Amino acid sequence: VSDNNVRFFDEEILPFVAKQYQLNLSTSGNDRCIVGGSSGGITAFAAAWHKPEAFSRVYCVSGSFVAFRGGHEFPTMVRKFEARPIRAYLTTGTRDMENVAGDWFLVDQEMDKSLKFSGYDYQFRIIDGGHGAGYGDEWQEAMAFLWKNWPEKVKAGPSAPRAQEILIPGEDWQLAGEGFKSTRGASTAANGEIFFADTSADKIHRIGLDGQISIFAEKTGNAHCVTVAADGSLYTISEKSGQLLRYDTAGKSSVVLDGILGHSILAHPNGSLYVTDNDAKKANNGGSVWLIKDGQKQQVDAGIKFATGMAFRPDQWLLSVGEGHSKWAYSYQIADDGTLTNKERFFHLHVHDWDDEAGAECLCYSQEGRQFIATKSGIQISADDGPTQVILTVPDKGRVTAVAIGGKDKDTLYAFCGNKIWSRKIQQHAT
C-alpha cells in the first residue's frame, strides 16, 4: 500500500536498466504501463496510485486488495482521495482465492465499485477461472484499452460525489508561495485575508485579497500560531517568551498574558480565546485546552495525547480539537460560560500505511459546514457525522501543516506545507 515499490522501480530499477543497456527510456508515466498479478497486482496498482507521473496505465490481475499489510484499505482510499490520472484494467476469477486475509473475488469487485464511484477510466472483467485469471485472452483487450488514444495523456476522472460538491472542474492546485521555513497556524480575517506564522523565520505573514504574500510582523518571538479576532486584531503565542500577544491592524504588538506556551490559539466572536498546549512530561496524555477570558486562564479539558489545532463549527456551538498523535480529532459542545462539555473522539482520520498517526494539525470550517483538517495524508474533509469524506493531496504529496479558506470571494483553499503554500478555488467559502 505504501510508495516504497514505485520509488524503487522509478528511481532505481529503471534508471539502472537504461544505463546498463544504453536505452533511451521515457520518464513520463503517460508512456508507461505497469502489470502485475496477485500481490503483484496490488503492487502495480499502488505504483500507479502513488505516482501516476511514473505509471499512468495499470493492468491488475486478481489484485490482492485483502488484509495483507493494509491492502483492504484501497477500495476506501479510492473513494475518498481526489481521483488521480490513472487508466486501469482489472480482472478477477469466479473461483479466485480465499483465505484468512479475505476473498479475492469479493474485494476485486469492491475495487470495481470504488473505481466506478470515483469516476475512473477503467475496465473490470470477471473471468471463469481461478486465481490469476486474466493473463490469457484478456491481454489483447487490456492493452488496446490501456493504450487507446496514446500519446494523448490519461486524465483524472471527476472524483466521488462528495468531492464534486467541493472541487471545481479544471481548478487545480497552484503554487501560491515558497521559500518559507515552517508555515503554521493559519487564520482567516472577516474580509478574506489570511494570516500565518513562519515560526523558524520569526515572522507573521499576510495573504492579501489579491493572493500576494507580505510580511505582517517581524521579531514575533517565534510566533507558533495565529488567530484573527472579530475586531480584526490578531493574537499569537510567542514560543520564545511564553507570552500571549495581541497585534493591532497596523502590526503593533502588546502583551495580553504571561506564562503560556500554547500550540494553537482560536478567537471566539465573544472576545474569549481558546488555547491548546502540551506537557512534555506526560507523553501520552499531556494535551490540554484552556479558556482565556477577562485576562484569566482556565483549563477546560485535559488528557489529550497531543492537542493541536482548533476550529468552531459555523454556529459556534461545537469546538473541534485535533489530536496530533492519533487518528482522531475531538468534538466538544461549548457551554454558555465557555467551558467544554460532551467531549468525544469524533472525527476519524485516514492514516498513511507508513505513518503511525494522522498528524492532525490545523483545522478550519467552511460556511457550508465542512471541516478541513491539515494532516500527514493531505487535507481531510469531513461533515458533522465525523468520518472523513474527501482527502486532497498537494502536488508534491507532502505533509500539510496548516489549512485555511479565504481570498477576495472567500472561496480559495490554501494548503501550507512547510516551505511552500498551495492554493485552489473551491465551491466552499470561509466562515
Identify what each model region corresponds to:
Residues 1-155:
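Non-catalytic cap/lid and distal C-terminal segments of serine-dependent acyl enzymes
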Residues 199, 239, 278-280, 324, ...:
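Short loop/turn segments immediately following the C-termini of beta-strands
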Residues 401-431:
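Blade-level signature of beta-propeller repeat domains, shared across WD40, Kelch, NHL, RCC1
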Residues 156-172, 286, 340, 431:
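Blade/loop signatures of beta-propeller domains
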Residues 178-193, 219-238, 242-243, 259-281, ...:
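Beta-rich, blade/repeat-based domains predominating
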Residues 172-178, 212-217, 252-257, 296-302, ...:
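A short beta-strand motif characteristic of beta-propeller blades
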Residues 332-339, 426-431:
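Short loop/turn segments immediately following beta-strands, especially the blade-tip
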Residues 203-205, 243-245, 287-290, 328-330, ...:
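A short loop-to-beta-strand structural motif that recurs across blades of beta-propeller domains
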